[in-house]
Amino acid sequence: MNFYLLFKSLHLIAVISWMAGLLYLPRIFVYHVENLEKEEAIEIFKIMERRLYFFIMRPAMITTWLFGVILIYINGLDIFSQLWMHIKLFLVIFLTIYHEYLGICLKSLKLKTNTKSSKFFRIINEVPTVILILIIFIVIFKPI
């Protein structure tokens, strides 16, 4: 069995799951903020947000990192001599920080201390898309 391809497949599955959450959670925040007067809807959004963040996004982020580190180990540390890998890691670290920021937003919505507008959440919803596009092009083309 080719373990490299196995771990690469698992890494990609984890990345896709993580990205789905990073793209969807801010959209739920938009609906949450736009329906603050509807208590029943807010309770549903809180459940959706919590489950998405803790049961899909967090495990997907952890397994993305885990399988990514395993792939680096299999490839050998000399992969760090390539600039594209440094850029990719920087972008993945940025996505991780963004993920944690969404966790802060989740908590502020839960505690009713949120000061962000639905427009804000619509705008930050584009961040992971741009980063994903950059990562894909960097990994496929390895331009530098």
Where are these regions (language model features)?
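Polytopic transmembrane helical bundles with strong interfacial aromatic enrichment
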Residues: M1-I144
